[in-house]
């Protein structure tokens, strides 16, 4: 039977990662998960996280980034995720001020498309 990798979304473990980020990742690996989707980085750099994932046999399944971070520091975000080895950046939430109707959705869609083009 083919094995499909399963990752845990670290937002669901935000209390645990706030208390002990590396320890939480160790426990995730011990439980048998194949990877994690980041929702914050616990103050660790991309290289540190990549090393920890490699040590634990985990893969990066994606990561959350606020749209404001993409607007303000896209080049830094790109560099961070390249170093981490992450291929999938997710904007997890948009405030109502961002979309507020059909024109707002079109604007957000265009902006996200531009970010996606740069992140590739």
Question: Across the structure, where does each feature detected by a protein language model lie?
Answer:
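Mobile, glycine- and charge-enriched loop segments
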Residues: 1-12, 50, 54-63
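Distinct, well-ordered alpha-helical segments
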Residues: 17-21, 47-52, 74-78
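Active-site acidic/histidine proton-transfer and metal-coordination neighborhood
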Residues: 35, 59, 67-120
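Boundary/entry segment of secreted carbohydrate-active catalytic domains
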Residues: 1-19, 24, 34-37
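Active-site beta-loop-alpha junctions enriched in small/polar residues
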Residues: 9-13, 39-41, 65-68, 93-96
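Catalytic domains of carbohydrate-active enzymes, especially glycoside hydrolases
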Residues: 22-44, 84-87
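Glycine-rich, proline-tolerant flexible connector loops at the mouths of alpha/beta enzymes
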Residues: 33-56, 99
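Conserved, mostly hydrophobic/aromatic
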Residues: 8, 28, 36, 53, ...
